[in-house]
């Protein structure tokens, strides 16, 4: 087994290194371990290595990082990995580094002493992934989280092999999440007052190992797009109105458009401004004393001229009064005549 690690220039410290190798080797086989990592001087661009979380103060010059391994006296060491040596006829070699959504997954079915194989079959969770064939390599171009599981392979050795089908031990393949499904939040509230401003924030984060990648964001309302994809994870509504009420969601996608995820819907309800009621109306100031009536000028007449219509009505009323008086006079005369006949003496004479 060979170990190669080449440094191109002298440096005071080394950036986080990655030791690449297959996780399982066949006994008596040859394998090269490659140490990959940028090398820079103290003024270089790899300052992140020195800024990792520090360990206990008692460790002196040693600091630890869950991602980069550890540092000692200014040097950064790769994170260790487990290497297995197998004496089986077949082994399935998986990737040495973490596999994320969107990556290409490559599996190798290797035989003892690299003897040629035929009728090779790859399996996932015990189910064949295809018919037998001569290829000892299986790949998934754009892996998803659902592609994780236990894989193994089987094949038949050509001469001088045993001639029977052999199977490799299962290997667990875990696909890491590149970024979580975004969550849409409304700031300061999902129930803003009419006329206020609202900021929609599409919140998610890339995995630390892929933090150099970028995500593009877009926003939607009631099935229609509100913005084109861009690097900004926020959408601002400067002046909210009742028309802005509805169901919103956002989408985060990688720059190569291979991985996209949507957020759950968020209901935005814009509260209309309430007009003040009579009880809420502020009291009016007390009115001062009324001004005195204006003094009449000498030119203004004291009485206005009578109304012609009123004069006509008065004439009719006087005429009716006179008619009533005449009628009353006739009634008085009639009553006098009747009183003569009603006297007692007059009645007796009339009876004789």
From Swiss-Prot:
Disulfide bridge positions per record: 109-153, 202-250
Taxonomic lineage of the native organism: Eukaryota, Metazoa, Chordata, Craniata, Vertebrata
Predominant cellular place of this UniProt entry's protein: cytoplasm
Pfam families: Ig_2
Biased composition (Acidic residues): 50-61
Tissue: Highly expressed in spleen. Expressed in immature B-cell and B-cell lines.
Keyword Disulfide bond set for record: yes
InterPro entries referenced in this protein's UniProt entry, alphabetically: Ig-like_dom (IPR007110), Ig-like_dom_sf (IPR036179), Ig-like_fold (IPR013783), Ig_Fc_receptor (IPR050488), Ig_sub (IPR003599), Ig_sub2 (IPR003598)
Residues in the signal sequence: 1-30
Quaternary structure annotation from Swiss-Prot or TrEMBL: Monomer or homodimer; disulfide-linked.
Species whose genome carries this gene: Mus musculus (Mouse)
Domain of life: Eukaryota
Stretches for region Disordered: 46-65, 275-310
Gene Ontology biological process terms in this record: cell differentiation
Subcellular location as annotated: Cytoplasm
Function: May be implicated in B-cell differentiation and lymphomagenesis.
Single GO cellular component term: cytoplasm
PANTHER family, per database record: FC RECEPTOR-LIKE A (PTHR11481:SF71), IMMUNOGLOBULIN FC RECEPTOR (PTHR11481)
Domain Ig-like C2-type: 80-169, 182-260
Protein name, per record: Fc receptor-like A
Signal among keywords: yes
Keywords: Cytoplasm, Differentiation, Disulfide bond, Immunoglobulin domain, Repeat, Signal
């Amino acid at each position: 087994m060979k170990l190669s690690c080449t440094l191109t220039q002298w440096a005071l410290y080394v950036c986080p290194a990655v030791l690449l190798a297959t996780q399982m080797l066949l006994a008596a086989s040859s394998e090269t371990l490659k140490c990959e990592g940028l090398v820079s001087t103290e003024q270089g661009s790899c300052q992140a290595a020195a800024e990792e979380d520090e360990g206990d103060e008692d460790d002196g010059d040693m600091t630890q990082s869950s991602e980069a391994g550890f540092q000692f006296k200014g040097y950064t060491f790769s994170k260790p990995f487990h290497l297995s040596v197998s004496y089986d006829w077949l082994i399935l070699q998986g990737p040495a580094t973490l596999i994320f959504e969107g990556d290409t997954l490559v599996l190798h079915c290797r035989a003892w002493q690299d003897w040629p194989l035929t009728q090779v079959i790859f399996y996932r969770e015990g189910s064949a992934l295809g018919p037998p064939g001569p290829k000892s390599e299986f790949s998934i171009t754009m892996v998803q989280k659902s592609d994780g599981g236990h894989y193994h392979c089987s094949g038949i050795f050509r001469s001088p092999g045993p001639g029977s089908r052999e199977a490799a031990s299962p290997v667990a393949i875990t696909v890491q999440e590149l970024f979580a499904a975004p969550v849409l939040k409304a700031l300061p509230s999902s129930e803003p007052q009419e006329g206020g401003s609202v900021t929609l924030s599409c919140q998610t984060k890339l995995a630390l190992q892929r933090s150099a990648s970028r995500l593009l964001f877009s926003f939607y309302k009631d099935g229609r797009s509100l913005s084109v994809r861009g690097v900004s994870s926020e959408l601002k509504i400067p002046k909210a109105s009742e028309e802005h009420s509805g169901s919103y969601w956002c989408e985060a996608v990688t720059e190569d458009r291979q991985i996209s995820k949507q957020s759950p819907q968020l209901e935005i309800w814009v509260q209309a401004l309430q007009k003040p009621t009579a009880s809420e109306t502020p009291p009016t100031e007390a009115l001062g004393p009324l001004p005195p009536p204006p003094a009449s000028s000498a030119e203004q007449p004291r009485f206005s001229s009578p109304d012609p219509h009123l004069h006509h009505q008065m004439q009719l009323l006087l005429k009716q009064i006179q008619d009533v008086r005449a009628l009353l006079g006739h009634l008085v005369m009639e009553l006098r005549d009747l009183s003569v006949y009603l006297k007692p003496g007059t009645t007796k004479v009339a009876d004789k």
